[in-house]
Amino acid sequence: MLKGQKEGEAEPVPEGDKSGAGSSPSGVRKGLRVPLGLVSHSFSSLAKHKEAERRLTDEEESLSSPQDREDDAASPNIMAKSIAGLLTTASMYVGIGDIHRAEQLATGQPETDAGADETEDEMDEAGDETGDDADAPATGTDGEEESRPVSAQESRRSTLFELSIEPHPESHTAQASRTKNRRSRMTSKLRSKFNLDDDEELVREYPCWLLRDVLIQGHIYLTSRNLLFFAFLYKSNGSARLTGNLSICNNGLSISGISGKPTRYWTVLKDHTLSLYSSSTDLYFPVLTIDLRYVTKVQHCKNNGKDTRQFHITTESKTYTFYSDNEHSARSWSSALKKQVFATQNSDNDSMSVRIPLSNIIDVEEQAIVEQGLTLRVRVMESSDSFALDDYFFMFFNNAGSQLKELIQIQVANLEMLGAANVDYARHPLPPDTEASLPAVASDAAPQDAAIASEAAADAAAADTASHSPSTNAEPRARGRSTERAMAASAYLFGRLTSPRRDDAKQLSPSKVKLRFRSVADTLKLTTPRQPGSDAPQEPEPETTILESRPRLNYWSPRPFTTMRSMWNAQPVHYAAKGMSLFADDDELMIGDEAELLAADKRFKAHFSLTDDESLVASYYTYLNRSMPLYGKIYLGKTIMCFRSLLPGSKTKMILPLHDVENCYKEQGFRFGYFGLVVVIYGHEELFFEFASQKSRDDAEYVILKIIDSLKPVDGVMADDMSAGAYSLKAAQGRDATTDAKVKLFEQRISSVGYDIPIMVEDNPFYKTTITPKKFYTFGMLTIGSRGDVQPYIALGKGLLQEGHRVVVISHAEFGDWVRSHGLQFRAIAGDPAELMALMVQHGSMNVGLIREAASTFRNWIRDLLETAWEACQGIDVLIESPSAMAGIHIAEALQIPYFRAFTMPWTKTRSYPHAFIVPDQKRGGNYNYFTHVLFENIFWKGINSQVNRWRVEKLGLKKTNLEFMQQGKVPFLYNMSPTVFPPSVDFAEWIKVTGYWFLNESSNYVPPQALLEFMAKARRLDKKLVYIGFGSIVVKDPVKMTMAVVEAVVKADVYCILNKGWSARLGGQSQKSIEVQLPNCVYDAGNVPHDWLFPRVDAAVHHGGSGTTGATMRAGVPTVIKPFFGDQYFYANRIEDIGAGIALRKLNACTLSRALKEVTTNTRIIAKAKKIGQDISKEDGVATAIAFIYSEMAYAKSLIKAKRQEDKKAAKEAKQIQNEDSWLLL
């Protein structure tokens, strides 16, 4: 203890010794050599006894038709060197005080300061990007410094991320009802669930991190005889954890047209599977599915010490090689896969636990991590006979580890005095009756009996550990990791957690040591720092020891076939699935042999990588008709319908959740003598099957319909049964959508210094771990155009504002008051959006006339835009720009700041969609689509390059550039559109993200006029369809004629219309503006009404097809008619028609509009499709997804800036050399 330090406080680390190097002969029994070059040292003694008791009481919560001849009325007008240094370099903070503060928040107590936890971020190098300097003042156009919008920013600690634990709202009431005897009740639950002795007592509990293949956040509990660790792992809720495009190269798979050539697929990481699909819209037919339960290794490849874009996934039978678009993406995929593999193979009921008897602890050593934290290495012996050792690394903060170490010493000393002997775990299995106890615990944790969060968490912890019975749950969790004896031992001692083995040559005989798993040193590569040129290109290492191989399945059939005809005419087969009673006991199609039943069920799960919760119900031989009839077999499970091709050379599989099936019905077959069955899927094309016998077809229809009915919730029955078990899942799903992205950014910071370790933040249903960035960026959002172009940026800006950042919207001056009303800063740029709108409407699409007029008329317009944009972007740290603004990529290069693009229409090169400004009248294929992007890019640059290059040289101080040097295809790109409307293309790069719409909800402050409400009520009272018609700020040649056509169409369609005559508001003559059309009683001129308030209250909508308006109608599930005028509106009109949610109206007059109104208000297919799309979009959070993408791609965006700077330096150096050579030649 240092001089002047109070008892119970942590010793400060000397300024010159940040690594915590020191020495102290602290060991529980016999001091062993510190691994991996670590030096152990001592920390402060224990706190006072009363302080310990108080903290213990406060911390127990944690457990817990042909075209008409009429004219178009809408025609347009004009870790450093060791494990100890791992987190020192990353500056992570999490503390025991977070639990304490969470309890105080939950119980209404005044919050106390947990102490100063400031640490320096040692990873930032001197002279790093200016984007890192978030303290630079944001300067407005008036030159005054603007203040931060969130005052709480100033009080945050200077760490890379703060991990603060906050209670879920559901646990607030439970927290307030805690009682004094909670400690005894917790001890009782631990005793019963962990099979502890009756006299065993809980001594202390701490939050900590367990270092394995991943770094896991959890809690550790010290009892009088055991050391227990518990953590909630990722929930298996069916949602995708990571999606994107990957290329796979594997000669053993027939998924590539050319052997050995990488093929690109849409990849989805979800629960225990990694699935590859041909496209992001065909998610029922996987090309390849890798079961993570059988993965033995995930390896991110390096070449000469540098990360590559390649990674391997090794299973028990083969190795798959994947290629991503860049090394950042490869690192993200490998990290996510490691965490998911760990959670899949070590989780029981979405949690994991470790149990270490104190009598088997050989040594406890401590190492410093951060100024107020350390790591405890606990070395444990399996038994006195085997001499097998396990090393466990527990990381603590706020010096809780030092206190725990001394408590362990005390408890071990007490056990030695009592003569306690080592426990042989292989001979002492857990009682089998404790299996699957967590559901009962979840029931206890329901809201009606969630007395204390800590007790519920303790129940879950105990249930998880108690369910690790080797005799009942030995498969398939920990495969290929250990010998049978070691597996049996660890199943008792450590649950399902596989652990590394280390041998100490000085103390143990090599013949008696079992090398069960690669060590932490092998996993983290921490013994030596990364050195360029030191590593050869890595190949996957072969697994030398496998505990048990994945079962090789024999193709058994319950009815042996003698001819191919007998197989085609085979009868259906029924199976007695557990928990379902669809068939009679005397069913002649039922399999009666128990062995045959189990074998068929096992094959079913193996074919489609299903979990043990699924069971086979029935199977049928059939043809699947897609592009051509494909013969195979249908498997019906309890909740799933699968198909597998039986034709040689074909590997087609289908996995269709029956929750997505709306109906199925009988139909005639395409071929004579066959019987058809149509399966109707929500939001998807129907599937058509043909059966050789009518009996099989009818039976399949009956069974499918019965299963669908059983999956529908029954009021008052299923809801009650599920409420308790779903409580913890619901609470855990409240996790912030940006959490994983922030963890990814944190992992990238660690990886930048040479270490690769995924981090798993605990998915605790009772406490929410929030991660707050250390650095607060000033985000600049540059856009031009109409109100619809600015609105998404306001929504995104408000989301970034909640994250603690500063946001500046840079656009036309007329939007300033609107932007500021939402709490965002605003800076004006030149340009009249009405003039731009008139130009675009006059030409409609990209053509020579548009280019010529723009070059002559808008030369000064573009010049002023570039100059004012440069001035407005001063002082920002990250720039997000609509590429139509033209200036952003050059400004970001000059300011050396990260640069993102965001847009509402197709802009990046792809074969799936044409460029929004060159949309053909009919689909022309992928080559044409790609050509439109190349054509537009060149035309667009040709029109502005001379002005841009002059501006670059004179104003920005940069050299001239061209399309090749700009590398626009590498810029991180956000599409603020729904993937339901704009599915991401397979050829999109990993840095292109379709996030979902950025909705700006303004209905909360809107008070509708009484006349509008009465009009809507009258329409409902008369049983009339209510439609909205409005075209935003579109400029038309004759607004009066257009209004008359709209009114006549409404009367013909016999509907009621809410009208927004925005088309007569801009650039119209005074005579036109003064002429008004007399509106009938069925038309109400409402003006501007917030879309999020109005659209859910109407039956259909007619609009111009702007991105924002299209998103609002799709979000509300409203059938839509789009009359496009220019640009991306044609694209959206086609998309809405393609997905079946509306009609694209090429010509607007009374006849065409009235027919369209009748169609969208009466066609049940369009209505149902729009409703389904609305349900899908309502589940999206576009702003949160965009923020997560920005966090995850920030490192990549910075790397682009660095690369450009290095290229400039290299070019300048070469130019200087050439100049010197020329000078010498002149001499």
From Swiss-Prot:
Taxonomic lineage: Eukaryota, Fungi, Dikarya, Ascomycota, Saccharomycotina
Pfam family of the protein (one): EryCIII-like_C
Subcellular location field: Cytoplasm; Membrane
Organism for this UniProt entry: Eremothecium gossypii (strain ATCC 10895 / CBS 109.51 / FGSC 9923 / NRRL Y-1056) (Yeast)
Function: Sterol glycosyltransferase responsible for the glycosylation of ergosterol to form ergosterol-glucoside.
Protein name: Sterol 3-beta-glucosyltransferase
Protein topology in the membrane: Peripheral membrane protein
Coiled-coil boundaries: none
GO cellular component, one term: cytoplasm
Any one biological process term the GO annotation gives: sterol biosynthetic process
Family according to the record: Belongs to the glycosyltransferase 28 family.
